[in-house]
């Protein structure tokens, strides 16, 4: 690539960072870093009605948490928010008006709605009908004067050549073309409040910031021909476009929707649950891109080195919550204990469980956790009531050899002094019980695990027994023997 690579992530501060937007940011970041280019953050805040307080801060904070950095942003550069760039937009709107490539439109929202209703009733796709069509200059002047007298504020529309073909070679999808007649007619580039519309402002911004590539979701494909209209009108070279496929829910096969409250979709949600940022970064990087091979766990450095925009998938990317949980568990299992302990601390504190056993409990459950917040539920045994047994667990306790195995193991535990109730001293008791009773394998370990912890699965049993403490374990074993 001869041209300096400059890409941007340009969120609207209208809410939290969605997983889909995070993917857009991440792919642009990987693309820029792989090619030694610039990654730019720009805030598109022209939609004042949907503006959310702290929306910008939330976007940047969560991108930073994911491990991304950037070369230019509103934090370091002036006029990187669209609301600060209004004079620049006005300059080019005035240029288009002067050149006759744009014009003031006085049709009211009610009139436009009525036009669209008639078109729909006739089976025609809604499109703008030029209000000046067929008017003489005098008629046009009289019409404008009448509208001004009624205090109707105009919008500015750009003229669309309906005979033109707008085409581009998409990085992901290959050659795409749109007929001008399908754009929907002359469209608004400046609203009544003086703010530019998205499709106009984004072109001015991308040109002004020398953006070389625009990589975004394929819900923007319909915006691209509109933006090409502006590039042509202003005589500018368009960047190269790439449109990533949709993200779908792996269980339903439907587009991932913010209205789907059963699926966590915001980066903030994963932060609050104690997921590791490295795992989320890794997971998102594989949503619609794959370097090939069977490997699924990559460091940020590996992803930057391997990233190839030509391997972006043409098929929808499946968001699989189970896969994400598996990945986070892998990261937690292999992370430094100090990092995992720090991650679990807020949850232990909130549950009033940050006591002298906290470190040992986190060590015990580190291999099991799919997210740090699970430490509370996992440690319920140590702080709450004995769990309700499953039918399968009850069947195991009802086995013919269970009473002998439990009573023998219980007697040996009881002989251990309180100060010697450690993993090193507990572990040999299993072998001693096996030798004395002849009960071995699953028929020995499983009833003891169920009786001591209430579960058929869990962390290392000797460690669990040691942390529960002698008094509690003996009480649990007695309860099982007396049933």
Curated annotation (Swiss-Prot):
Alphabetical list of InterPro entries matching this protein: aa-tRNA-synth_I_cd-bd, aa-tRNA-synth_I_codon-bd_sub2, aa-tRNA-synth_I_CS, aa_tRNA-synth_I_cd-bd_sf, Glu-tRNA-ligase_bac/mito, Glu/Gln-tRNA-synth, Glu/Gln-tRNA-synth_Ib_cat-dom, GluQ/Sye
Subunit description: Monomer.
Its EC number(s): 6.1.1.17
Protein known as: Glutamate--tRNA ligase
Motif ('KMSKS' region) on chain: 255-259
Single GO BP term: glutamyl-tRNA aminoacylation
Organism: Lactococcus lactis subsp. lactis (strain IL1403) (Streptococcus lactis)
Signal sequence annotation: none
Subcellular location: Cytoplasm
Coiled-coil stretches noted in the UniProt entry, renumbered to this chain: none
Motif annotated as 'HIGH' region, chain positions: 11-21
Residues reported to bind ATP: 258
MF GO annotations: ATP binding; glutamate-tRNA ligase activity; mannan binding; tRNA binding; zinc ion binding
A Pfam family per the record: Anticodon_2
Superkingdom to which the source organism belongs: Bacteria
Reaction it catalyzes: tRNA(Glu) + L-glutamate + ATP = L-glutamyl-tRNA(Glu) + AMP + diphosphate
């Amino acid at each position: 690539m001869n041209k300096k690579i400059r890409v941007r992530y340009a969120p609207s501060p209208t809410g939290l960072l969605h997983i889909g937007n995070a993917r857009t940011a991440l792919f642009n970041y990987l693309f820029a870093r792989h090619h030694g280019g610039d990654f730019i953050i720009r805030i598109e805040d022209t939609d004042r009605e949907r503006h959310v307080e702290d929306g910008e801060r939330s976007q940047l904070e969560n991108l930073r948490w994911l491990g991304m950095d950037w070369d230019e942003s509103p934090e370091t550069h002036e006029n990187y928010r669209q609301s600060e760039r209004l004079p620049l937009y006005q300059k080019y709107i005035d240029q288009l008006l002067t050149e006759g490539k744009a014009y003031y439109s006085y049709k009211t929202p009610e009139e436009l709605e009525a036009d669209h209703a008639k078109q729909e009733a006739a089976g025609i796709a809604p499109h703008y009908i030029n209000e000046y069509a067929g008017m003489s200059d005098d008629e046009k002047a009289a019409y404008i004067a009448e509208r001004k007298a009624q205090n109707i504020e105009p919008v500015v529309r750009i003229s669309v050549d309906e005979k033109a073909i707008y085409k581009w070679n998409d990085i992901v999808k290959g050659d795409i073309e749109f007929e001008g007649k399908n754009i929907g007619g002359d469209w608004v580039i400046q609203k009544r409040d003086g703010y530019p519309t998205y499709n106009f402002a984004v072109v001015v911004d991308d040109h002004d910031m020398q953006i070389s590539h625009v990589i975004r979701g394929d819900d923007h494909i319909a915006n691209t021909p509109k933006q090409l209209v502006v590039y042509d009108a202003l005589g500018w070279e368009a960047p190269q476009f790439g449109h990533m496929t949709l993200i779908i829910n792996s269980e339903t096969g439907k587009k991932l929707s913010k209205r789907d409250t059963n699926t966590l979709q915001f980066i903030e949600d994963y932060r609050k649950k104690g997921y590791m940022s490295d795992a989320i970064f890794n997971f998102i990087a594989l949503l619609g891109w794959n370097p090939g091979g069977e490997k699924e766990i990559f460091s940020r450095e590996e992803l930057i080195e391997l990233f190839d925009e030509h391997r972006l998938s043409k098929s929808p990317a499946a968001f699989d919550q189970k896969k994400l949980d598996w990945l986070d568990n892998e990261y937690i299992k292999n992370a430094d204990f100090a990092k995992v302990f720090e991650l679990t601390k807020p949850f232990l504190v909130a549950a009033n469980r940050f006591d002298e056993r906290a470190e040992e409990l986190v060590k015990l459950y580190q291999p099991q956790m799919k997210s740090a917040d699970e430490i509370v539920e996992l440690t319920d045994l140590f702080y709450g009531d004995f769990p309700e047994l499953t039918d399968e667990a009850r069947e195991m306790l009802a086995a013919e050899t269970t009473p002998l195995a439990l009573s023998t193991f219980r007697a040996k535990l009881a002989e251990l002094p309180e100060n010697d109730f450690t993993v090193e001293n507990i572990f040999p008791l299993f072998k001693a019980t096996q030798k004395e009773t002849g009960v071995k394998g699953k028929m020995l370990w499983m009833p003891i695990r169920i009786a001591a912890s209430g579960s058929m699965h869990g962390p290392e049993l000797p460690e669990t027994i040691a942390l529960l403490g002698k008094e509690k374990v003996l009480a649990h074993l007695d309860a099982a023997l007396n049933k």
